[in-house]
UniProtKB/Swiss-Prot annotation:
PANTHER family, per database record: NH 3 /GLUTAMINE-DEPENDENT NAD + SYNTHETASE, NH(3)-DEPENDENT NAD(+) SYNTHETASE
Protein name listed in UniProt: NH(3)-dependent NAD(+) synthetase
Reactions catalysed according to its record: deamido-NAD(+) + NH4(+) + ATP = AMP + diphosphate + NAD(+) + H(+)
InterPro entries, A to Z: NAD/GMP_synthase, NAD_synthase, NH(3)-dep_NAD(+)_synth, Rossmann-like_a/b/a_fold
Length: 271
C-alpha cells in the first residue's frame, strides 16, 4: 500500500529545489499558453502552501510577459472571514510574492447569509465544521469570479500530504484548474521556499486550515492526528510507526472519492 500511495502522489525521496522550481514555473507557463488564458488567480492565506504557489505563479507570469511581449497577470486574492487574526503573516507573504495585482474579498457576509439561509430552510444550525467547509467553498467561488472576469485560471495549493489525507474541502480549496505543488511533500515545499528566499516566518508558520470559529488556528497536525514529518517520511518511502502508517492508509482509502470526478454507473474506483 505504501508504494502505491507514493506512486499516486509522485513524491521523490530526494529533490533538487532549483530544478523543481524551474519545472513548476515551466508547467504554469505552458498550461496558461495552451489554455489561452491571460493570467493566474490564487488565494493567499499567509501559510507555506499559498506563499510557495503564489511565488511560482508570479515568476511564471513575469517570464511569459518577457518572452512574449503580451500581458499576463498574477492576481493574489486575500479572502478573510471578517478580521483575520494572523493578517500580519498574510501581508508578509504578499511582500515575498510581490504579485502583479491583489484584491481582498471579505467572505463573511456571503458565508453568514448562506448559513442563515440553511437555518431558515431546515430549522437547524449548521455545524461549525460544515460552516468551515462553506468558507472554503465561498473562497473558491470568489476566485473563480475574479478569474472569469480577467480571463485567468484558478491555481490550487494541493500537495502530496494533503492529497493522501484528503485534507481539503471538496469543491472548496480542492476545486481549481491546475496544481503546481503536486508531487511535493511538506518538507520539500519548505526547501523550495528556502531556495526562493522566503521570510522565515512564512516558511515555518504552523500550518492551519483555520476554518472553524470554535477552534481558530487549529493546527493541521492536531486535526490529522499525526505530524507532517511522519507523513513526509512515509511518502519518501521510509519506515515509520506502524500505527501511523495504518492511519495514513485508512485516511487515504476513506478520502479517495476526492481524487475522482463524480462517481457514475460506469466507474469502478468506488467499488
Amino acid at each position: 500500500m505504501q508504494q502505491h500511495i507514493i506512486e499516486s502522489t509522485h513524491v521523490k525521496p530526494t529533490i533538487n529545489p532549483k530544478e523543481e522550481i524551474r519545472q513548476r514555473i515551466d508547467f504554469l507557463k505552458a498550461y496558461v499558453k495552451r489554455a489561452g488564458a491571460k493570467g493566474l488567480v490564487l488565494g493567499i492565506s499567509g501559510g507555506q502552501d499559498s506563499s510557495l504557489a503564489g511565488k511560482l505563479c508570479q515568476l511564471a507570469m513575469e517570464e511569459l510577459r518577457e518572452e512574449t511581449g503580451d500581458e499576463y497577470t498574477f492576481y493574489a486574492i486575500r479572502l478573510p472571514y471578517g478580521e483575520q487574526h494572523d493578517e500580519h503573516d498574510a501581508q508578509l507573504a504578499l511582500e515575498f510574492i510581490r504579485p502583479d495585482k491583489s484584491f481582498t474579498v471579505n467572505i463573511k457576509p456571503a458565508v453568514d447569509a448562506s448559513v442563515e439561509a440553511f437555518h431558515r430552510a431546515t430549522g437547524l444550525e449548521l455545524s461549525d465544521f460544515h460552516k468551515g467547509n462553506t468558507k472554503a467553498r465561498e473562497r473558491m467561488k470568489a476566485q473563480y469570479d475574479i478569474a472569469a472576469t480577467f480571463g485567468a485560471l484558478v491555481v490550487g495549493t494541493d500537495h502530496a500530504a494533503e492529497y493522501v489525507t484528503g485534507f481539503y474541502t471538496k469543491h472548496g480549496d480542492g476545486a481549481c484548474d491546475l496544481t503546481p505543488l503536486t508531487g511535493l511533500n511538506k518538507r520539500q515545499g519548505k526547501a523550495l521556499l528556502h531556495e526562493l528566499e522566503a521570510h522565515e516566518r512564512v516558511i515555518y508558520k504552523v500550518p492551519t486550515a483555520d476554518l472553524e470559529d470554535g477552534r481558530p488556528g487549529l493546527p493541521d497536525e492536531v486535526a490529522l492526528g499525526m505530524t507532517y514529518d511522519q507523513l513526509d517520511d512515509y511518502l519518501e518511502g521510509k519506515t515509520i510507526d506502524p500505527t501511523i502508517a495504518e492511519r495514513i492508509e485508512t485516511i487515504f482509502k476513506r478520502s479517495r472519492h476526492k481524487h475522482h470526478m463524480p462517481a457514475s454507473l460506469y466507474d469502478e474506483w468506488w467499488q
